[in-house]
Amino acid sequence: MERDKILCVDDEEMVVEALKIELVNSISSDIIIETATSAEEALLIVNETLKQGDRIILVISDQKMPGMTGEVLLAKLDKIIPQALKIMLTGYTNLEAIQYAINNASLFRYIQKPWEQED
């Protein structure tokens, strides 16, 4: 049976946990929430999810992370899971990163940290 998943990616553990708590309180209990603290871990989770026959319906990623940045991760994921919505979070306004994500990752939304629950 195909299960829907949401993937939250941020190098700060507290941020992914806060996202997970907000999502659990806002979405169907049928949707599984996965978390990753690096882009590399996120790619592994996506590959494992697809191998299991499940699907990622939404990716929420921080922009500024060590190693691979959020906009590069989202662009890679757009090639693997183009149907997934992609949201980028950042505490820093980097218009070049946002433009890159819009043009290369089909960015659905950009949210400034700290976010409001309505975001």
Model regions: which residues?
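Active-site beta3 strand of CheY-like receiver
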Residues: 7, 50-60
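Helix N-cap/capping motif at the beta->alpha junctions
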Residues: 35-48, 70
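Conserved phosphotransfer cores of two-component systems
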Residues: 48-54, 77-83, 104-105
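Receiver (REC) domain active-site loop signature in two-component systems and cognate sites
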Residues: 65
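Alpha4 helix (beta4-alpha4-beta5 surface) of REC/receiver domains from two-component response regulators
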Residues: 72, 93-110, 117
